[in-house]
Swiss-Prot record:
Residues where ATP binds: G407, A408, S409, G410, A411, G412, K413, T414
UniProt source species: Arthroderma benhamiae (strain ATCC MYA-4681 / CBS 112371) (Trichophyton mentagrophytes)
Pfam families in UniProt: ABC2_membrane, ABC2_membrane_7, ABC_tran, EGF_2
A GO molecular-function descriptor: ATP binding
Protein name: ABC transporter G family member ARB_01379
Length: 1101
């Protein structure tokens, strides 16, 4: 830096010229000549002598200033920043980011671009000015210092010479220095300027930097081992006819040292100084200063992470908070377990104590204040899929009596009972049903009827008392007090003999225990209907699956109900015991959907005796009649083998009742009737057709039991009151004489007689089976006529009471109105159903506890795997993975919502059909107790554990939005699964559809398929994806305002999270739109689920 020492000598040059010459310095008086002889050949051209030669730095006559490198390809100089021209002698303007596009200075000074300054516009002033030099064109920092500052990459300094005497000597001329260093090359260079004209320049190499930082002072030191300088021709200090420092530059060998001092608060010691042994001696001798003094400003454009002293913010994981959250969630689970244990130990209701008298009065009024209901029906027919199931059934069920509907399997008993109970049938129903001679619409009719299904469907987690009480609370009058309803429940329990088991759980085969027995369950089902004191009670196979003792107890309870409270009880029954049959008041016998008998049970045996189908002694008449309809329904054939049981004994007399004391029919292995053993094999062989093999014992017994006997061949079906009292059985000849007149009776088939098969009467036209004969006999019997007359009389009396004309149109009108009562309101229904649902939930807590335990365990595991997410690209990828995993976990765990209604589908359908409650209250209670414990709490538990462990943004607004998105997503997924579970009845199909829907939604989340890569025609599918809404909302909430660090170009570049999200196809402004989308899908799916339940889960039999 010899130029600094010589700066003060300019005014003294004329005076000290002899001295400099004596000391070896040279002052030129003539211009140097260009030497061209050194070139290997002489270039000759037609260039005129007045034109200068073209610049070519490869020729000795030309050189590169600023010690620029000569480009061997174009003969031009590669200049350092801020200099240009062919020889790097011209300062450039504009700004550093312009690079090769910078323009040479025109005039005495440069017009720099905004944010740039200096003689050659190399000094930055603002951060925005540096952005253009950054790889991503943002994040730039103008690193400026006054008298100091470490060179990070390549810095530039603008200095003012502060030696007082030097400035005084130059007067108005301003000495300045530009100085720059490049750390990678360990080089520096400077230029000396007088009035912004460069005089000379120097280059330093093998440089070292050091910063000494103390509490009050920063000291920056540059030390370069080598130094060389050069002149700009015809400039001050490098004049061709005046002072030239070039000979002095040859003596500068270094080392050179440049120091800058900056103190806290500023002091007179602040500044920069340059020292070099030769220069220091000259300055000391001439100006009395130790070195050249400068006041410098340095600047350097850096990426913000490269600024010295910059430290990326270090995330602090709050370990105590994490431990506290995990402990709190664990304590919550323990609390839930303890609560469940306490509730399961506590009895559902305290032991019953005596209630107030007014409760007894209300219960008594309920039982007594009703109008006896006599049920009449005629011409009941039913068609489904073009097939007739029932045909022309007629009968009466009277109050105070029990009416039994019997028939073989497939006879249509249950179908007929459903029609009487006004159940919703899939087929077409014809006929008339009257109550006390009047017709009623379905809503009025169902107010006073109760129906007990064959299968007992109840919640296994409720006790007997709770099950019956729920029926009472929901179905008894609104103005009836709870105490009176409980009193009514206890009365029914005692009446049915189940009071002693009132606190036992119903139970099930799949549960922890079997619970109560099958007979007890049947009585509980009956109690649920009896508690409402219906005027008409229908029961489908009430003895099904019960042993004989329990079956009798159930029927006896029904008989007591009918007799004691004047109720009408109608039930179907299959093969009852004789002691049960004896309790019947009315009997309806069906065969293949047709009426074989319908009337008083007391007339049944006499009726069948008189038409020739006497129940053998010792047989249960119910079994006999059911078997009779089965055998009679078989096609008739004269070729069937026959057995002669009466040809040998014309004095045989038969009884009119199975209760009379006569010998019983033997078993199939020893079938006989009185004196049948007297028939020898010779007689039997004569009676058997010659081409037929011997009849089996079963066929023989069936022929004995179910073939019409003599004494029944009357001109018309007999009236049970006109039985032949002597019981005389006609002889074979007398029987044979009756075939002709019987065959002439209006299409009736003469009864089949046990006689010689060769003498069987011909089959009458119009009938295929003996069942047709039985049906025809009944239709023309006095019993049927009596029933028909009674129905007609009842209808006419009702019409007369209502003041209507006796006409067919009047009889077809709906005129009746039941004396029903107001049921409880929707709010009360919701409270009762919520209580029932809550009990069912906490008494079967495994699903709920599994959800909670899974949430805690997977939250801790996820927090461990993703612990302390970093703010870089790797951390961004881990965030994507974390959010994707959380959503997949909750999405597929909500498949348990498929079973919310499947396990209670049948229960709901039946309770709805029986008028327990409104569907909306049941749906609301079920959804509420599925959403709160299973869909709301687990994501909150998991969120509060995962969020602090993985180090997501530690701000309450972001945390709240994170939890909100998880909860809404869980609700939306649960709503979709709920809808699927209702629409698809089969659990396997529902699980498959639910899984496919979740996978489809997962595909459009935004991680597996970029938004911008989705075809335009399929883009609308993404609007249906709940995973897309939730995934985008979570990642936008976390990353939008986050700055991620990406290591590129040797720098730690901070990349805005928003730009990365945009590259992945996410919308940075879509957070609340996504939240709204999740909310809409949640609401729409739940509404659609209710609509599906309301319209699809309707009882159709």
């Amino acid at each position: 830096m010899a130029w600094l020492a010589l700066l003060g000598l300019l005014p003294l040059l004329p005076a000290i010229q002899p001295t400099w010459q004596a000391n070896g310095y040279e002052i030129n008086s003539t211009a140097d000549s260009f030497v061209t002889a050194a070139t290997p050949f002489t270039l000759r051209s037609a260039r005129p002598p007045e034109c200068p030669p073209c610049f070519n730095c490869q020729l000795p006559a030309f050189k590169c200033h600023q010690f620029g490198k000569c480009n061997k390809f174009n003969g031009k100089c590669d200049c350092p920043p801020g200099f240009g021209g062919d020889d790097c002698a011209e300062p450039l303007c504009g700004s550093l980011p312009d690079g090769r596009d910078r323009t040479p200075r025109k005039g005495s000074t440069c017009q720099c671009k905004d944010g740039w300054s200096g003689i050659n516009c190399n000094m930055c002033e603002t951060n925005d000015a540096c952005n253009a030099m950054m790889p991503e064109r943002e994040g730039g920092v103008c690193y400026r210092h006054h008298n100091g500052g470490e060179t990070v990459a390549e810095n530039y300094q603008m200095c003012e010479v502060t030696n007082r005497k030097i400035r005084d000597m130059l007067k108005e001329k301003k000495p300045q220095v530009t100085f720059s260093c490049k750390k990678e090359d360990k080089t520096c260079n400077f230029q000396f300027w007088v009035d912004q004209l460069e005089s000379f320049y120097c280059s330093l190499d093998t440089c070292k930097w050091n910063m000494d930082i103390t509490e009050n002072q920063n000291l920056t030191t540059y030390q370069c081992d080598n130094i060389k300088c050069g002149c700009v021709p015809d400039r001050m200090l490098c004049e061709t006819t005046g002072v030239s420092l070039e000979p002095l530059f040859g003596q500068l060998t270094g080392p050179a040292k440049f120091t800058s001092t900056s103190t806290k608060g500023g002091s007179n010691k602040d500044g920069s100084a340059f020292s070099e042994p030769v220069i220091d001696k000259v300055i000391s001798d001439l100006f009395g200063d130790k070195s050249i003094l400068l006041d410098c400003y340095s600047s350097e454009c850096l990426y913000k992470t490269a600024v010295p002293g910059y430290k990326p913010p270090v995330k602090v994981i709050n370990t105590p908070l994490i431990a506290g959250v995990i402990a709190g969630c664990s304590l919550f689970i323990v609390g839930v377990i303890l609560l469940i244990w306490y509730l399961s130990r506590r009895k559902a209701y305290n032991q019953y104590h005596a209630l107030a008298d007014d409760s007894d009065d209300e219960g008594s009024k309920l039982m007594a204040d009703h109008k006896p209901a006599s049920l009449q029906f005629e011409n009941i027919s039913y068609y489904i899929n073009g097939q007739q199931i029932l045909s022309g059934i007629r009968g009466i069920a009277k109050p105070g009596q029990v009416t039994a509907i019997m028939g073989a399997s497939g006879a249509g008993k249950t179908t007929f009972l459903d029609i009487l109970a006004r159940k919703n049938k899939r087929g077409v129903v014809h006929g008339d049903i009257y109550v006390n001679g009047e017709k009623f619409n379905d809503s009025e009719y169902k107010k006073v009827v109760g129906f007990v299904d064959q299968e007992d469907t109840m919640l296994p987690t409720l006790t007997v008392h709770e099950t019956i009480l729920n029926s009472a609370l929901l179905r008894l009058p609104r103005d009836m007090s709870d105490a009176a309803k409980q009193q009514r429940v206890y009365e029914v329990e005692k009446q049915l003999g189940i009071h002693h088991i009132k606190d036992q759980l119903i139970g099930s085969e799949e549960g922890k225990g079997r619970g109560i027995s099958g007979g007890e369950k049947k009585r509980v089902s009956i109690a649920c209907e009896l508690v409402t004191s219906p005027s008409i009670l229908f029961l489908d196979e009430p003895t099904s699956g019960l042993d004989a003792f329990n079956a009798f107890n159930v029927i006896e309870c029904l008989v007591n109900l009918a007799k004691s409270y004047n109720r009408t009880v109608i039930f179907t029954i299959h093969q009852p015991r004789s002691n049960i049959v004896a309790l019947f008041d009315q009997l309806i016998l069906l065969g293949k959907g047709k009426t074989v008998f319908s009337g008083p049970y007391s007339s049944c045996q006499s009726y069948f005796d008189n038409i020739g189908y006497s129940c053998p002694p010792g047989f249960n008449i119910a079994d006999y009649l059911v078997d009779l309809t089965m055998h009679a329904s078989q096609s008739r054939s004269t070729e069937e083998p026959a057995v002669n049981v009466d040809s040998h004994d014309n004095n045989f007399r038969t009884a009119s009742s199975s209760l009379r004391a006569v010998k019983s029919v033997a078993s199939a292995s020893n079938a006989s009737i009185d004196n049948a053993s007297a028939v020898d094999s010779a007689q039997e062989s004569l009676l058997r057709p010659k081409d037929k093999r011997r009849s089996s014992l079963k066929q023989r017994q069936d022929r004995q039991l179910y073939t019409r006997k003599r004494g029944s061949g009357l001109e018309s079906p007999p009236d049970p009151q006109t039985d032949n009292e002597d019981g005389h059985v006609m002889s074979l000849a007398e029987r044979a004489q009756q075939w002709l007149p019987l065959s002439r009776q209006q299409g009736q088939v003469p009864p089949q007689i046990l006689q010689d098969p060769d003498h069987l009467p011909p089959i009458a036209s119009g009938f295929v089976t003996d069942l047709d004969v039985l049906v025809s006999y009944y239709a023309n019997s006095n019993v049927a006529n009596a029933v028909r007359d009674e129905i007609s009389s009842s209808v006419q009396d009702a019409l007369a009471a209502n003041g209507q004309a006796n006409s067919q149109q009047a009889s077809d009108a709906v005129t009746g109105q039941m004396t029903g009562y107001a049921r409880v309101g929707l709010i009360r229904q919701f409270i009762i159903l919520s209580s029932r649902t809550w009990k069912n939930l906490y008494r079967n807590p495994m699903l709920m506890l599994t959800h909670y335990a899974t949430a805690i365990l997977l939250a801790v595991l996820s927090g461990y795997l993703f612990y302390g997410l970093t703010d870089d690209i790797k951390g961004f990828q881990n965030r994507l993975g974390l959010f994707f995993f959380l959503l997949a976990l909750f999405g597929f765990s909500t498949l348990t919502s498929l079973t919310v209604f499947s396990s209670e589908r049948l229960l709901f359908v039946r309770e709805r059909a029986n008028g327990y409650y409104s569907p909306v209250t049941y749906f609301t209670a079920k959804v509420l107790f599925d959403i709160v414990p299973l869909r709301l709490i687990p994501p909150i538990i998991m969120g509060v554990i995962v969020y602090p462990m993985v180090g997501l943004i530690p701000d309450w607004p972001e945390f709240s939005k994170f939890i909100l998105v998880l909860v809404l997503f869980n609700l939306a997924a649960a709503g979709i699964c709920l809808l699927i579970g209702i629409v698809f009845r089969d659990p396997g199909v529902a699980n498959l559809i639910g899984s496919l829907v979740m996978l489809f939604s997962l595909l459009f989340a935004g991680l597996l398929l970029n938004h911008d890569a989705i075809p335009a025609s399929a883009l609308w599918l993404q609007t249906l994806s709940i995973f897309h809404y939730a995934f985008e909302a979570l990642i936008v909430n976390e990353v939008t305002f986050l700055t991620l660090i990406d290591h590129k170009y040797g720098l730690d570049i901070e990349v805005p999270g928003a730009s990365i999200l945009s590259a992945f196809g996410f919308n940075n402004l879509a957070l609340w739109n996504d939240v709204a989308g999740l909310g809409v899908i949640s609401g729409v799916s739940i509404i659609m689920a209710y609509a599906a339940m309301h319209f699809l889960l309707v009882e159709k039999r």
